[in-house]
Amino acid sequence: MESKLGLNMELVDQARASAAKVADDTQQFIDQHTTVTVERAVCRLLGIDGVNDMDVPLPNVVVDHLMANSLLPVGAAWAIGNAMVETGKDPQGVADAVNSGELDLSKVPAHSDAEIRGAITPVVNATMERINKNVAKRNSYLKEWGDKEGPYLYIIVATGNIYEDIIQAKAGAKQGADIIAVIRTTGQSLLDYVPYGATTEGFGGTYATQENFRLMRAALDEVGEEQHRYIRLCNYCSGLCMPEIAAMGALERLDVMLNDALYGILFRDINMQRTIVDQFFSRVINGYAGVIINTGEDNYLTTDDAITAAHTVLASQFLNEAFAKSAGMREEQMGLGHAFEMDPAVENTFLHELAQAQMAREIFPNAPLKYMPPTKFMTGNIFRGHIQDALFNMVTILTNQRLCLLGMMTEAIHTPFMSDRALSIENAQYIFRTMKDLGSELTYKENGIIRNRANEVLTKATDLLKEIEKLGLFTTIEKGIFADVKRPKDGGKGLNGVVVKDDKYFNPFVEVMKGKVGA
């Protein structure tokens, strides 16, 4: 891609190399550790499902049992496989026996690795076949109906009731939306378990559960078949259960997942060691399942200034790209995030927004960039808000952003009505249609505001990444360099769920998934 901004590609290469070094150094830590939610995700992928009489999910029952008996370092796959050899039960049977007290995994005689792997491999293969069928079904729909060119129209539903969400999601799809995201209930990030079953009460969103995923997937397939369009489903694998939600999404054919390497640390005060380990397995799963991940750089601009902190967004995009590559993801699955969040009271911010978006497109040419609408400076004036969203839509189409979360004129007033979404979709469709090829007609003046701004941000981001390379990721976060938020290495939620792996440890799903996409 020819650079319209005259970007110094040597600086881009230096920034990417620094980010890769940071990711490689951090990967050494990841490879040595596992967490309770990584092992619960393994349980789920082995087919363990359901809850006990106290509504505790059985993956939690098994992993809590492993933790209490100092078995977590060997991993769920080894412990369950060993019990399968001894008892002849399948993983669900092992979980049921642990729950009833019939089976104590710490007292099962140790069998050979060959026997354990022999017992567990058919179960792993069955799960992989299920995920492969989901990938094939998505590809079949896309082959039959084609995929959309230009930006995906991306909307949110958030009623708290999955059945109400389905009504709103189907309406949004019929109005023209391409991606439906179901916002999670407030605080689900901080639950160290995944709720079970269909849910009808949430706060600011709807619980992410496997049954809710299944219900919404079926509803969107139904409306997609009516419209002859594939409607993508999005949810959120951030928080204390990142890999579990990724596993559930892979099993139920979700298409897009919010999945940032740093978001939980910065914005939910989840321990950085926990998050860094969890994000790796979640991305391995998403990569194999053909899921597009969305990263959360847009959130930095809610706590920091979008003009002065723009280089931290770019630096984080480089890091998220590097961590995704470490997990075997393809660039085409990396929905690196940024946002239209500059203060509209400042002169020439539209030019700065355009520079930032074009810069991201040129630096990450294969990534389906996720572009977020204005929220911080939405005042409740719906007329001004609609214009702010229109300017955002203009930048989207001029710079070929791919996942365009549509702004709502009623931002800062209430959760959107179906009519609000209809107007938002109409706004975007009008601009995307009438300006479809305008971006290819434009060049940017040498030494002008747009080119100078982009090169200034790139230079600062490259310098910052060189500093992070020296400091290491954990120290960088402790210093508050991202989002102006400081987090201690040994603080936050979830650190007690991180353990060093035993020599016997293995994760069969990383072995078969990493660097591959299901077929």
Language-model features and meaning:
Residues 163-170, 240-253, 308-309, 383-397:
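Catalytic cores of alpha/beta
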Residues 156-162, 347, 380-385:
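Short, glycine-rich nucleotide/cofactor-binding loops
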